[in-house]
Amino acid sequence: MADKFYITTPIYYVNARPHIGHAYTTIACDAIACRQRMLGSDTFFLTGTDEHGQKIERSAAEAGITPQQLTDGIAGEFRGLWDRMGISYDDFIRTTEPRHKRGVQEMFRRIRGNGYIYKGSYSGQYCVFDELYVDAAGPAAPCPECGRPTETVQEENYFFKLSAFEDRLLKLYTEQPNFIRPETRRNEVMAFVRGGLRDLSISRTTIKWGIPVPDDPRHVIYVWLDALSNYCTAIGFGSPDKKDQQKFAHYWPADVHMIGKEIVRFHCVYWPAFLMAAGLPLPRSIVAHGWLLFEESKMSKSRGNIVRAETVIDVLGNDALRYFLLREVVFGQDGSFSFDALVQRYNSDLANDLGNLASRTLAMITRYFRSEVPYPSSASLRTPADDAIARTAEETIASFASLWDDFQFSRALEAAWSLVGAVNKYIVDNEPWAVAEQADEGSRARLATILYTAAEALRIVAALAHPVIPDATARIWEQLGLGNISHFRLIDLKWGQLQHGTKLGKVEAVFPRADKSAIERMQQMEQQRTTTQAAPIAPAPTTAPSPVTPAVTTPAAPAPAATADGRISIDDFAKVEMRVGQVKVAEKVKGADKLLRLEVDIGTEIRQVVAGIAEAYAPESLVGRKVVLVVNLQPRKLRGLESNGMIVAASVGDRGLPVLAGFLEDVPVGARLK
């Protein structure tokens, strides 16, 4: 029996239309699922939409439609886009479906039956935007996740004993380090749990748009318990049907939950705790990717900087978008999207490198060998250059697999394109067009070896890249005379398997070069879509909440007015606002040896700060550490990132290495320095 592989996207919240931020997650999952199928795995790929909650209820009321009408429309747009993009999902779950309602209520019953749910009352703040109960002081206090004003809620609730799982969760993270990936997110989650867990309200009585609590229909189940359960309900959990039960037993637990970094807490703290409480196995790995930025800012409807996947597809095709997102963005880190960068990457890697390799290799086989793959020379007649390509190809097969399995898609593709570059150089160095002009038998054999080597390398690149650029590689496969690439299994991928005498298919360009007009067309299409596709719902981003205020950076502080001897007044000093913050995330800035990107909790919000402390501090050593932050500086960009604040540190020694300011006593986050 084939190994099973179950992968999921997050289910997308239907408060706005899909854009390439959603496409990024879905493309990554689709590529992983495709490669698993090529490996022969029994693969199940799930996506869908999250359709309940107070935010949807209010948005529908503001639009003058029912919640069901709103969710039907937006869910249809998500499904339609995935179908247009050729996304190979096996199921599309909607949380308004009866099968999901049945499964969520069964999840609630199991958790309650195991003694982890009790009834109480909640009085405090609630963020409608994030569908999140928050610890905040006073009415309209800002949400620590998104910064928006919270609402005061006082109602009877059911509570989940989240506090009972603190030790079990920490043990999970320690014993299974790959449960949360990348490591920066794992450190962030561990710091959060070590800070102490409070019991979680998991029902509402003041809204109606949701799934009723079993045996107590006045209560609606908390939207995150509802939403997270989709990973189980879609494969049969809670169904009375025996086939559904067998399906759940076969595919669960999930092998990969792919999510955006903004919903790490819900998936890595709440979800495993819910499953432990229900007595169900845990997913094997939760992989959190970074944000996709548009010209250095996070995409959001309120900013008006959303880019729709259809815009790129209409001009450059599916493969261009898929390749750019997985090659350009280092998975797990934030990545930047722009039309200029997209076209540059398309022309460089796809049109020039791979497209050129395919076109000239197949064209020369067509011309010199009547469209049949030639017979290569025996080993004794091969040159070191021939053997080097064969060796590089075998090494690439191995390195690609290792990098891909570690979710390093960009580096895996870089390895594959190194082979493309090596073969293009091999063709230039060996000049098959010149060899073809020689009439002797030895030259004919040499020409055959050169073109066989190039064609075999092209076959290997096509097989490796197929999960990323499926349309183009399917066409290359057919042009090589190999038929339908979906029948190929990666276990058979090794050098020398291309059979001589194979008749080529019709040879045509795979990636025509794009000019500057492509950029202009995409920009115009985006402007038109922005004005004509205004969604009839309240403005808000599509997936779950953003935990960081929009990326911002550290400028030099405006210098207070000084006297002639350099002293400033107490009033001037009072203008500088310094607060205690706690580092939640720390990671290196690509291409900058001295810079770290930090996410710092200052009590009222989480700030992104770029700090020049990398020479003195390893990123992992900073997570959970308290620092002093100047919080009222104007934002400034460093290395394409914005920093909103400045870390206070001393400059020590001849090299001026930074030493962070700290406290001998414990000081609460958000405390102001005076």
Label for each model-derived stretch:
Residues I476-D572:
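Intrinsic disorder at enzyme termini
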Residues A2-I74, I93-R109, G113, D130, ...:
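N-terminal catalytic cores of NTP/NDP-binding nucleotidyl/phosphoryl-transfer enzymes
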Residues A2-T47, R99-G103, C146, T152-R367, ...:
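Structured secondary-structure scaffolds
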Residues I74-D90:
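A glycine-rich helix N-cap at a beta->alpha junction
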Residues P541-K674:
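Phosphate-backbone binding interfaces of nucleic-acid-interacting proteins
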Residues K119, A341-S378, I389-K503, V510, ...:
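Helix-rich, typically C-terminal accessory recognition domains appended to large enzymatic cores
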Residues D91-R102, G120-Y133, R186-N187, A288:
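Short, glycine/charge-rich beta-strand/loop segments that flank catalytic centers
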Residues N114-E166, L170:
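Cys/His-rich short segments
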